[in-house]
UniProtKB/Swiss-Prot annotation:
Family of the protein in this entry: Belongs to the peptidase T1B family. HslV subfamily.
Any single Pfam family the record assigns to this protein: Proteasome
Residues given in the record as Na(+) binding sites: 162, 165, 168
The protein's Enzyme Commission number: 3.4.25.2
Record lineage: Bacteria, Pseudomonadati, Pseudomonadota, Betaproteobacteria, Burkholderiales
Originating species: Burkholderia orbicola (strain MC0-3)
Name of the molecule in the record: ATP-dependent protease subunit HslV
Entry annotated with the keyword Lyase: no
Keywords assigned by UniProt, alphabetized: Allosteric enzyme, Cytoplasm, Hydrolase, Metal-binding, Protease, Sodium, Threonine protease
Subunit relationships: A double ring-shaped homohexamer of HslV is capped on each side by a ring-shaped HslU homohexamer. The assembly of the HslU/HslV complex is dependent on binding of ATP.
Principal EC category: hydrolase
Any single Gene Ontology cellular-component annotation: HslUV protease complex
Keyword RNA-binding (UniProt): no
Principal subcellular localization: cytoplasm
Gene Ontology MF, one: metal ion binding
Length: 178
């Protein structure tokens, strides 16, 4: 059975501001099932942003586990991400989950991959999902050549990804921490 998939999530950190955004499209095979899904959320008393890509059920399962780790480690983003990654690598059921997360707080942005890796992105820019490469390239160009805010860069990057990736639409949700 096919899984729901296809999305773009992008995060940009500039100075003391970070933005995390995603599109709203959920695809099953070659059919758009939903155009306004919310794949970017605020968690842990609105102090942490999280965006997810991959199989929808898998992503929600990982999001729930990440929230529990964040609570257990009193909001320490890095510790929660590493603990989730450890579980992901050692738990047979979790290893089958096909999803990725981008998490960000006031000081740190991390990508948690389907292999159980935790990555600290270079230059404060990261993207995941089917349109991730387009969004990341656009964000990098905008960071290097403009003075736009992280929110504006995320918005424009998602727009470019939506123009190029058939699994990404123009219904955007963007959250920021300043």
């Amino acid at each position: 059975m096919e899984q729901f998939h296809g999305t773009t999530i992008v995060s940009v950190r500039r100075g003391d501001k970070v933005a995390l955004g995603g599109d709203g499209q959920v695809t099953l095979g070659n059919i758009v099932m939903k155009g306004g899904a919310r794949k970017v959320r605020r968690i842990y008393n609105n102090q942490v942003l999280v965006g997810f890509a991959g199989g929808t059920a898998d992503a929600f399962s990982l999001l729930d586990r990440f929230e529990a780790k964040l609570e257990k480690h009193q909001g320490n983003l890095t510790r929660a991400a590493v603990e989730l990654a450890k579980d992901w690598r050692t738990d047979r059921m979790l290893r089958r989950l096909e999803a990725m997360l981008i998490t960000a707080d006031a000081t740190t942005t991390l990508v948690i991959t389907g292999n159980g890796d935790v990555l600290d992105p270079e230059g404060g820019i990261c993207a995941i999902g089917s349109g991730g490469a387009y969004a990341q390239a656009a964000a990098r160009a905008l960071v290097e050549n403009t003075e736009l805010s992280p929110r504006e860069i995320v918005e424009k990057s998602l727009g470019i990804a939506g123009d190029m990736c058939i699994y990404t639409n123009h219904n955007r949700i963007i959250e920021t921490i300043e």
